[in-house]
UniProtKB/Swiss-Prot annotation:
HAMAP family, per database record: DHO_dh_type2
Function: Catalyzes the conversion of dihydroorotate to orotate with quinone as electron acceptor.
Reaction catalyzed: (S)-dihydroorotate + a quinone = orotate + a quinol
Catalytic residues identified in the record: 194
Highest taxon, organism lineage: Bacteria
One Gene Ontology term from the biological process aspect of the record: 'de novo' UMP biosynthetic process
Family: Belongs to the dihydroorotate dehydrogenase family. Type 2 subfamily.
UniProt protein name: Dihydroorotate dehydrogenase (quinone)
Species lineage: Bacteria, Bacillati, Cyanobacteriota, Cyanophyceae, Synechococcales
Organism expressing this protein natively: Synechococcus sp. (strain ATCC 27144 / PCC 6301 / SAUG 1402/1) (Anacystis nidulans)
CDD domains: DHOD_2_like
């Protein structure tokens, strides 16, 4: 039985003055307690989660970068920043989980309130600012959870720049985080696309980005898959330039996309509980308003690289159809966060069941055969 939709979702969508960050922090805290506990009750609860939310079919399995993804649906970065619930994500049906964003220096993030739900648009608005306990703290957490290095699903780690580090020191800042964590993650993501760290998006310019990627690859002696997460607000020419740079630097893939700063996508004039005009609010939008543009970027990346650069698609996935559209546009894997919060934990299982139905309808043998099948030029 799923308790989320009848009990927790109404609270999320209500007009009560409930801080979304408080809800998220407490939900994550419960999962972290469950992950740490060795009690029989915790074991029974985890077994219940696996039975309720788990779903696997070999036709959905994907192999990338020497890793096996039993299911193509992963948890996007931003929810479990410090990895405190890392062992639990497989219990909830995810095929992989991306932790972070973490930075070299611990930082509190931006002032509260900094996370808002906008139910009428099925959206979230955040200006969290990479609040995290530091890359070294995440390393300690992962060593504690996985002392032998064995994880039930691939774990990705999303790396950002510390707010106190000037843009001129970005290279050493990213390298410092990577050094702390490089043996503890299955893949790594360079995040230069959050709108909530001053100047960060300027690092998406090829001339700024290339030294960062080159330094990380030089440090990448264990040959961990290194990916880049990009913004949906780039113009197509910038997306193409980044795709070529990614290939030149032999990146493992691209994650498309991060949040958007295009406030015209929202129907509201003010954020919940705020009087300031929306146009003056700093932050990024995730959820349904991002769906179309993120899929467009995926399609453009797939065409530009002729399908040679794996893509993880994220942005506005609330259903199997949303995930399918990103896959046929060129995504090999997909991630959820905002849609997962709105729809509940069963979303992951529902997506997988729906993907199988679409494979059958299309007469395709497996999900790999669907990747990019609708990305051809019209």
């Amino acid at each position: 039985m799923d308790f989320y939709r009848p009990l927790l979702r109404p609270l999320l969508l209500s007009q009560l003055n409930v801080d979304p960050e408080w809800l998220t922090r407490n939900a994550l805290g419960f999962l972290a307690t469950l992950a740490r506990s060795r009690s029989p009750l915790a074991a029974n609860l985890r077994s219940y989660l696996r039975q309720t939310y788990g779903f696997q079919d070999p036709r959905l399995a994907m192999s990338l970068w020497g890793l096996t993804f039993a299911t193509p649906v992963g948890l996007a970065a931003g929810f479990d920043k410090d990895g405190i619930a890392a062992p639990l994500w497989s219990d909830l049906g995810f095929g992989f989980a991306e932790l972070g964003t973490v930075t070299a220096l611990a930082q509190p993030g931006n002032p509260r309130p900094r996370l808002f739900r906008i139910p009428q648009d099925l959206a979230a608005f955040n200006r969290m600012g990479f609040n995290n306990a530091s890359a070294e703290a995440l390393a300690d957490t992962l060593r504690g959870y996985f002392p032998e290095g064995q994880r039930s699903i691939p774990i990705g780690i999303n790396l950002g720049k510390s707010k106190l580090t000037p843009l001129s020191g970005a290279v050493s800042d990213y390298v410092s985080s990577f050094r702390s964590l490089r043996s503890l993650g299955d893949y790594f993501v360079v995040n230069v696309s959050s709108p909530n760290t001053p100047g960060l998006r300027s690092l998406q310019a090829v001339t700024e980005l290339e030294p960062i990627l080159a330094a990380l690859q030089a440090e990448n002696t264990e040959q961990r898959p290194l990916l880049l997460k990009i913004a949906p607000d780039l113009v197509d020419e910038e997306v193409v330039a980044i795709a070529h740079l990614a290939q030149r630097q032999q990146l493992a893939g691209i994650i498309a996309t991060n949040t958007t700063i295009d406030k015209s996508l929202l129907s509201v004039e003010h954020l919940p509980g705020r009087r300031e005009p929306l146009a003056t609010e700093a932050g990024g939008i995730s959820g349904a308003p991002l769906r179309s543009r993120s899929t467009e970027v995926i399609r453009l990346l797939h065409r530009t690289t002729q399908g040679q650069l794996p893509i993880i698609g994220v942005g506005g996935i609330f259903s199997a159809e949303d995930a399918w559209q990103k896959i046929v546009a060129g995504a090999s894997l997909v991630q959820v966060y905002t849609g997962w919060v709105y729809e509940g934990p069963l979303l992951v299982k529902t997506i997988q069941q729906g993907l199988l139905e679409r494979l059958d309808s299309a007469g395709l043998p497996n999900l790999a055969a669907a990747v990019g099948s609708a990305a051809i030029d019209s």
